[in-house]
Swiss-Prot record:
ATP binds at residues 32-39. The keyword Transport applies. Keywords: ATP-binding, Cell inner membrane, Cell membrane, Membrane, Nucleotide-binding, Translocase, Transport. Pfam families: ABC_tran (PF00005). GO terms for molecular function: ABC-type thiamine transporter activity; ATP binding; ATP hydrolysis activity. Coiled coil: none annotated. Belongs to the ABC transporter superfamily. Thiamine importer (TC 3.A.1.19.1) family. Part of the ABC transporter complex ThiBPQ involved in thiamine import. Responsible for energy coupling to the transport system. The complex is composed of two ATP-binding proteins (ThiQ), two transmembrane proteins (ThiP) and a solute-binding protein (ThiB). The keyword Translocase applies. It catalyses: thiamine(out) + ATP + H2O = thiamine(in) + ADP + phosphate + H(+). This is Thiamine import ATP-binding protein ThiQ. It comes from Escherichia coli (strain UTI89 / UPEC).
Amino acid sequence: MLKLTDITWLYHHLPMRFSLTVERGEQVAILGPSGAGKSTLLNLIAGFLTPASGLLTIDDVDHTTTPPSRRPVSMLFQENNLFSHLTVAQNIGLGLNPGLKLNAAQQKKMHAIAHQMGIDNLMARLPGELSGGQRQRVALARCLVREQPILLLDEPFSALDPALRQEMLTLVSSSCQQQKMTLLMVSHSVEDAARIATRSVVVADGRIAWQGKTDELLSGKASASALLGIKG
């Protein structure tokens, strides 16, 4: 379970403050206007930002100040951050061993996740030889191979065309269900959120303004629907 209690980040001396509980294995969408604090919330969970105050626990362990490298979290960005001089296999392997010295069990795990992502025939290629969708599959494989209990997505598929974006969302959702991972995804699209998350959180002005069923948001019946430009 992920729990944030009054986690506070000072942005130009103005506090953003978040309290949120997410159960293990739950898939939650984080929505809201541009500049509302959605990515800030994800970066606080990942450890890329250190809160001024508050408490963040994962499975009842305090991770408020745990460095990102030691936090049980993986994060995927729109910019996939693949190393251009490393092959697909090496980029995925970094998720298992930064020195790329993989034992037999790790090699097996790497090839299994590559097969799951549908990129097992691309392992010897460099990122520059791949399409945008293929690069995001590699980046997702690197996240999943780490087998951390929480996966954070910061609009990683927004640059993809609608059909490919839906394909990637389905792949992420099924992979998280298979590995029993908790998923939090920032998105500007309620439609995308509805594809994988039954529950949504709406962030506005550095606060969680609303949380509830994604379908309720999409129907325009929720109090926060207007924040997303949805009319009932």
